[in-house]
């Protein structure tokens, strides 16, 4: 991800996420042409990149149906307009690749318990193989949390995604009892049932790739507070979702609570999530869709205040949904571009106890007529993950302050060479190494004076590869 430097101070580490919804083609894809779908996604990600968004939660399992080839479940109807039809490409792989090109994390959003209408392909396929696994509530099918194999099935599904794809996270949605479910067990037993499912998924993905984050989107209010009531709709009691307990137990790396509220329905419950985060990541979901006149017609000030408080509290932010954000509803995109004046890295997974990578051993800078050409090498990973990432910093002050987000010009970069347009300036550079857990090495610095002393390289030589 290449970005321009700005003067506004923003945190160096902060989750800035969006939910990219595929069900019913709400955010993407908007057409059934594979070519147009790819162009649409590129346009969306370019917009997100310009607003310094660093995490995309893409809905990959929709309703027992997928946007990628799977032996377990059929293609979702959103891809071609026909359920089960192959669109001719792997949309999840394409999204991962395009996110990584832009220095963004890509998390596979997995809708867990709901499996769609009773007679849809995905629901029927599971019922045919496992007749006791799906329960009908009204016209909808749901995986039964009280069947032990539900956790096994979902763990197998998430393991398959983790093994086959370079996802940065598995994001569980609806990991709870449905609100329409007639609970026949105690609330405590219901919570144990859901927690058992989470444990199985956690074990499965960490056995494959321990750096892959496991997260979920819990109901926005965990439970009643001493001074503020949840109005009967909360995670812990209403739907048996002990999300704070999952952080405490260490079987969840991050939470994205669906905090689609304002005022006293928002701020006290934000404080509660922070107080019980146990050192893990929390990035509350904000209801940017509520800004739309056909929804609640909120004023932009509601979202603006919430974003300011979340930043002051050291929490991340997640937007629901992507289209309302990129459509600049009530100016939310414009505000966010200014608010996120500098890029940010994802907070490191320090609880995994991994030793950070060794820094690069060499950093060379050559100067052409238009760009500084950086090359580096010699870094070493200590985490056992599959590859390293690099962050590049630039400043007119030496040494470059790598703790200042304003100096970060390229984040989560896979290569070991970069051309930086210098526009006639003499800049100092620093490169750090980052492992898949987000641990960052010490910086290798290069002085601008060294650049000025080098022979100027004709840009025409660069074009012909000399």
Regions found by a protein language model. Name each.
Residues 39-66, 164-169:
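Catalytic domains of carbohydrate-active enzymes, especially glycoside hydrolases
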Residues 100, 105-117, 171, 190-236, ...:
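Aromatic-lined carbohydrate-recognition surfaces of secreted/lumenal glycan-active proteins
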Residues 51-87:
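Aromatic-lined carbohydrate-binding/catalytic grooves of carbohydrate-active enzymes
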Residues 13, 19-39, 92, 96-97, ...:
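Active-site-adjacent "subsite" loops/lids of carbohydrate-active enzymes
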